[in-house]
From Swiss-Prot:
Any single Pfam family the record assigns to this protein: Death_TNFRSF11B
Sequence ranges of the TNFR-Cys repeats: 24-62, 64-105, 106-142, 144-185
Gene3D superfamilies in alphabetical order: Death Domain, Fas, Tumor Necrosis Factor Receptor, subunit A, domain 2
Glycoprotein keyword on record: yes
Protein name: Tumor necrosis factor receptor superfamily member 11B
Organism: Bos taurus
Protein's gene: TNFRSF11B
């Protein structure tokens, strides 16, 4: 009896494996009335419907689905499925209807589908951070910030951030943070000014880039070196600049080094004074923005080339005043991307920020800054300080290169 039972189980196992074994094209059992036999017919592929089942003399006949109809699997149906109608309010077409798939609708950025409605993602209040960001299918999941972490903003994307380690910045803990506030460190304003040093401001970069001719002659850099007043940049430094940077970037790097070597000269002090006036204008455009940590991070991600890291953004937020944070991060980006032009980088970022639903006031302020850095005001400053300073010889050379 046991032997018979074992044989039956083995036979059943073999039968199951045979019937479930994958074949291509997939098959199905069909009774053929002509031959009075059960036949293994081919199923119809996606994008078609079953027009005629197979017979002993003919294979399965499939026909294409008509417009606005589809099938998305191998099947045995004699009709196609009708595509879903147009998308609902606050949805967009993620995938259009075709013969092989249905129309796919999805809620707009920042919303998720609940029953038949696209609802706005939940924003986590101060003291709570995002555990799971919202998707088109589910709402944001918030979690109370644990000990040692905080969130001081209402956001649908920002997680809890770790309290500042004051000692890591050489500061003393004045007031311990909680779920809604960061630690407060003593001497933060004085130390921030020092630690938030910006390698080169936007105005300095724009000013020095105006000195780069549209078309460069082979001896442009040599003529510039010979005509710059004050302490000359040595040959070793010039050679290093030539090896590390492309031809257009070389002029910018040379002027940056020359300015550093002659910072005590009256002519350079005059340049710095006028550039400071320019910086005041830039700060009027972007110094008041008070971007959140999340917004600063998204802006850095939108810039081309090598990225400023999350750790860099965190450190900048903790050591720089709010009016200096964006300028500092742009300076860090430029350092990471040696030959990149910050103004062009911002132009690239603006195209992407629009898709992230970035605040319009921020985008408008960035646009104004970009226009200002490439305006006649900057060119006039360049002519006043640079061309007059290095003389008519270099001016003639630059004009002949334009």
């Amino acid at each position: 009896m046991n032997k018979l039972l074992c044989c039956a189980l083995v036979f059943l196992d073999i039968s199951i494996k045979w019937t479930t074994q994958e074949t291509f094209p997939p098959k199905y059992l069909h009774y053929d009335p002509e031959s009075s036999r059960q036949l293994m017919c081919d199923k119809c592929p996606p994008g078609t419907f079953l027009k005629q089942p197979c017979t002993a003399r003919r294979k399965t006949v499939c026909a294409p689905c008509p417009d606005h109809y589809y099938t998305d699997t191998w099947h045995t149906s004699d009709e196609c499925l009708y595509c879903s109608p147009v998308c609902k309010e606050l949805q967009y077409v993620k995938q259009e209807c075709s013969r092989t798939h249905n129309r796919v609708c999805e809620c707009e950025e920042g919303r998720y589908l609940e029953l038949e409605f696209c609802l706005k993602h939940r924003s986590c209040p101060p003291g709570f951070g995002v555990l799971h960001p919202g998707t088109p299918e589910r709402n944001t999941v918030c979690k109370r910030c644990p000990d040692g972490f905080f969130s001081n903003e209402t956001s649908s994307k920002a997680p809890c951030r770790k309290h500042t380690n004051c000692s890591a910045f050489g500061l003393l803990l004045t007031q311990k943070g909680n779920a809604t506030h960061d630690n407060i460190c003593s001497g933060s304003s004085e130390s921030s000014t020092h630690k938030c040093g910006i390698d080169m401001t936007l105005c300095e970069e724009a000013f020095f880039r105006f000195a780069v001719p549209t078309k460069l002659t082979p001896n442009w850099l040599s003529v510039l070196v010979d005509n710059l007043p004050g302490t000359k940049v040595n040959a070793e430094s010039i050679e290093r600049i030539k090896q590390r940077h492309n031809s257009r970037e070389q002029t910018f790097q040379l002027l940056k080094l020359w300015k550093h070597q002659n910072k005590d000269q009256d002519m350079v002090k005059k340049i710095i004074q006028d550039i400071d006036l320019c910086e005041n204008s830039v700060r009027r455009h972007i110094g008041h923005l008070n971007l959140t940590f999340e917004q600063l991070l998204k802006l850095m991600e939108s810039l081309p080339g090598k990225k400023v890291t999350t750790e860099d953004v965190e450190k900048t937020v903790k050591t720089c005043k709010s009016s200096e944070q964006l300028l500092k991060l742009l300076s860090l980006w430029r350092i990471k991307n040696g030959d990149q032009d910050t103004r062009k980088g911002l132009l690239h970022a603006l195209k992407h920020l629009k898709t992230y639903h970035f605040p319009k006031t921020v985008i408008q302020s960035l646009k104004k800054t970009i226009r200002f850095l490439h305006s006649f005001t900057m060119y006039r400053l360049y002519r006043k300080l640079f061309l007059e300073m290095i003389g008519n010889q270099v001016q003639s050379l630059k004009i002949s290169c334009l």
